[in-house]
Amino acid sequence: MNLKLHIKTYGCQMNQYDSSKIVDLLKNTHKYQLTDIAEEADILLLNTCSIREKAQEKLFHQLGRWRRLKKINPNLIIGVGGCVASQEGSNIRERANYVDIIFGPQTLHRLPEMINHVRITRSPVIDISFPEIEKFDCMPKPQAKGPTAFVSIIEGCDKYCSYCVVPYTRGIEVSRPCEDILLEINNLADQNVREIHLLGQNVNAYRGTRYGGGTCTFAELLRLVAAINGIDRIRFTTSHPIEFTDDLIDVYRDTPELVSFVHLPVQSGSDRILALMKRGHTVLEYKSIIRKLYAVRPSIQISSDFIVGFPGETEEDFRQTMNLISEVNFDMSFSFIYSPRPGTPAANMVDIVSQDEKKQRLYILQECIRKQAMKFSQAMKGTVQCILVEGTSRKNIMHLSGRTENNRVVNFIGNNGMIGQFVNVEIIDVYSNSLRGELISNQEKKYTLSA
């Protein structure tokens, strides 16, 4: 009998990556087949995120729906993983005693043994420890699911920003050995992956050991990945300004495989707020990085993260943030109203900003960046862009879909044989979240820089 696994994932790309690894692992060890239908599953897993507000409520709301399935099928196994699991631990079972497995981001590789334990003993198991990079040693060979692939290079974060829960839920920074990463990417390249997206809470903190001794920096790793045959594009998420080195900027100058798009979170344009956030850099230092990036890659486009309504944020602080947004001309952002995360220093700060004011500031910020992004998109109309065709369009299966170097989704008419290939497409229309293109007949030129 084929056993079925249903997994629901909240949060960042790292969580998406972890979930894909869980699927591959359990397929390998228990022959589980993935299903989108919770009602037909033998095991239900919830991979959680604690970054945003009401993460716990979201978790227990979902568990409440699954509880009904457990009553129908007592042999159903329910597991909770990810950052909320790491943060809450046994508290989850105190509120939901029907949960069988609780595992953290660093112990997902132990799921096969946890499942066996529950099956044999019918008793719950909790493992939210931090065994460094052990989980990567236990994972099966990566299975490509298209022409793009995520690869985790570093886990955790040591920066301890005052608002952030990541160091407490994913642990301190631990870099994977350089050769392990290169082996994984070579395996993916052999499966016709053309674009690699390197992942970490702070990728530019990467300091991986080499088998022959010594340390590999993030800049060096990028150069090594670019040298792998078949890998034509490299992206990465997320970076921190305090470790965005000149050596890393030089990689943008020398390495065409590294795309002309970077996500560099700043959170605020006020030095006073940045100090309260314990970000470790000033606005001027951030702008210096951007200036250097533009100098070596004039076509580069920048996205960022912003928190509005941080405790103590005044109108002047917010005005400085808006000034930075206009000056840098960000292409997009992930922006949110501040919400206190349990256990973080900022959770104890006095919050003087009303909720209505926070909402108004968020609207102003997002509207400004939306207009800037639309200007970038409009400027691309009539240009020829090099698209990596990722698959069929989500809205129209008769159309193909792919991304430009500057991370724009483009939908166009083509044949399925183009999936996994780079094609040149003329941009003929612009929408709020995508572009429409037309395949051009001359496909000789492999890359066309984004506008």
From Swiss-Prot:
Function: Catalyzes the methylthiolation of N6-(dimethylallyl)adenosine (i(6)A), leading to the formation of 2-methylthio-N6-(dimethylallyl)adenosine (ms(2)i(6)A) at position 37 in tRNAs that read codons beginning with uridine.
GO molecular function: 4 iron, 4 sulfur cluster binding; metal ion binding; N6-isopentenyladenosine methylthiotransferase activity
Compartments where located: Cytoplasm
Family as reported in the entry's similarity comment: Belongs to the methylthiotransferase family. MiaB subfamily.
Annotated Pfam families: Radical_SAM, TRAM, UPF0004
Source organism, top-level taxon: Bacteria
Residues binding [4Fe-4S] cluster 2, per UniProt: 157, 161, 164
Record's subunit section: Monomer.
Keywords: 4Fe-4S, Cytoplasm, Iron, Iron-sulfur, Metal-binding, S-adenosyl-L-methionine, Transferase, tRNA processing
Organism: Baumannia cicadellinicola subsp. Homalodisca coagulata
Cofactor (UniProt): [4Fe-4S] cluster
Domain MTTase N-terminal as annotated: residue spans: 3-120
Location of the TRAM domain: 378-441
Swiss-Prot/TrEMBL catalytic activity: N(6)-dimethylallyladenosine(37) in tRNA + (sulfur carrier)-SH + AH2 + 2 S-adenosyl-L-methionine = 2-methylsulfanyl-N(6)-dimethylallyladenosine(37) in tRNA + (sulfur carrier)-H + 5'-deoxyadenosine + L-methionine + A + S-adenosyl-L-homocysteine + 2 H(+)
EC code(s) of this entry: 2.8.4.3
Residues at which [4Fe-4S] cluster 1 binds: 12, 49, 83
CDD domains documented for this protein: Radical_SAM
Domain Radical SAM core residues, every copy: 143-375
Cofactor note: Binds 2 [4Fe-4S] clusters. One cluster is coordinated with 3 cysteines and an exchangeable S-adenosyl-L-methionine.
InterPro entries found in the cross-reference section: Elp3/MiaA/NifB-like_rSAM, Methylthiotransferase, Methylthiotransferase_CS, Methylthiotransferase_N, Methylthiotransferase_N_sf, MiaB_methiolase, rSAM, rSAM_horseshoe
The protein's name: tRNA-2-methylthio-N(6)-dimethylallyladenosine synthase
